[in-house]
């Protein structure tokens, strides 16, 4: 599809030094854009990093690089919002949705037992649905999904059609979840934010799409979660490489999302 050159733009911000020096993660961002959008995109990422509710960063890195790989275009996952009254209800629903996506109850509980230990992991944890064990070797870094985006005009058209607020947070989360789910090794994703002011989370997968859950934690809580439940019989290193390096653009088509 690509005649235009695209660039991967990444931002990360932390407090009390860089992430490598043990600093507290404040904010991050990923964009995949043509060059003429560079200045606007960098400014938006700068603003995002400087105005996050997790704190004021004293370290920030914004970098961009040309993307040489062919860009794949995929559809966004279908979206459904589940209204719940409290985090306990939200977490109970999340477990049920994970089970419906093909993760056994035993493996779900094994993951939940370890989620508190993973609260400092900056990226995602890969968890095998067969063994109930963590598959990535990235420790506190986690796996960072990169090189994906959803062009604003198409996202806004989708949001209007789907009766969803055209908020950048939804755009970024759904673009990431759609890329994660697209790969054959993916079974399900469990996520809630480390932002103390944002309590909505989701379960995503191929069977039921992107299932938003309106309360997954209490306000003021800075512990987030991102777990990818995967079929470990696939090549895990290939999956990690694709998550980090394969460029993906989301493009919604109305007739596809009936």
UniProtKB/Swiss-Prot annotation:
EC number(s)? 6.2.1.14
Q: Which terms does the record give in the GO molecular function aspect?
A: 6-carboxyhexanoate-CoA ligase activity; ATP binding; magnesium ion binding
Which UniProt keyword terms apply here? ATP-binding, Biotin biosynthesis, Ligase, Magnesium, Nucleotide-binding
Q: What class of enzyme is it?
A: ligase
Any Pfam family matching the protein: BioW
Biological process (GO) annotations? biotin biosynthetic process
Q: Which cofactor does it need?
A: Mg(2+)
Q: In which pathway does it act?
A: Metabolic intermediate metabolism; pimeloyl-CoA biosynthesis; pimeloyl-CoA from pimelate: step 1/1
Classification via InterPro entries:
BioW
Q: Which domain of life is it from?
A: Bacteria
Family to which the UniProt record says this protein belongs: Belongs to the BioW family.
User: Per its UniProt record, what NCBIfam families does this chain match?
Assistant: bioW (TIGR01204), PRK01322.1 (NF002360)
The record's HAMAP family line, in alphabetical order, gives: BioW (MF_00668)
Subunit and partners? Homodimer.
Protein name, please? 6-carboxyhexanoate--CoA ligase
**Organism (species):** Bacillus subtilis (strain BSn5)
Which lineage is the organism of this entry classified under, starting from the top rank?
A: Bacteria, Bacillati, Bacillota, Bacilli, Bacillales
């Amino acid at each position: 599809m690509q005649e235009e050159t695209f660039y991967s733009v990444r931002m990360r911000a932390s407090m009390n030094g860089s992430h490598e020096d043990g600093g507290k993660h404040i904010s991050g961002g990923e964009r995949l854009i043509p060059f003429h959008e560079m200045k606007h995109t960098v400014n938006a990422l700068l603003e995002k990093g400087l105005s996050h509710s997790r704190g004021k960063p004293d370290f920030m890195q914004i970098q961009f690089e040309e993307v040489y790989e062919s860009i794949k275009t995929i559809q966004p996952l279908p979206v459904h919002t589940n209204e719940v009254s409290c985090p306990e209800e939200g977490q109970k629903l999340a477990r049920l949705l994970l089970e419906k996506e093909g993760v056994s109850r035993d493996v779900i509980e094994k993951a939940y037992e370890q989620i508190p230990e993973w609260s400092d992991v900056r990226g995602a944890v890969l968890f095998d649905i067969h063994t109930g064990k963590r598959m990535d070797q990235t420790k506190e870094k986690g796996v960072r999904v990169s090189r994906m985006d959803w062009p604003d005009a198409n996202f806004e058209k989708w949001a209007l059609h789907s009766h969803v607020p055209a908020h950048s947070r939804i755009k970024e989360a759904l673009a990431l979840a759609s890329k994660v789910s697209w790969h054959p090794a993916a079974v399900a994703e469990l996520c809630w934010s480390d932002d103390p002011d944002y309590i909505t989370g989701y379960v995503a997968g191929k069977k039921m799409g992107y299932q938003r859950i309106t309360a997954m934690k209490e306000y003021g809580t800075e512990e987030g979660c991102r777990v990818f439940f995967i079929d470990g019989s696939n090549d895990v290193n290939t999956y990690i490489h694709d998550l980090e390096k394969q460029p993906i653009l989301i493009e919604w088509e109305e007739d596809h999302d009936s």
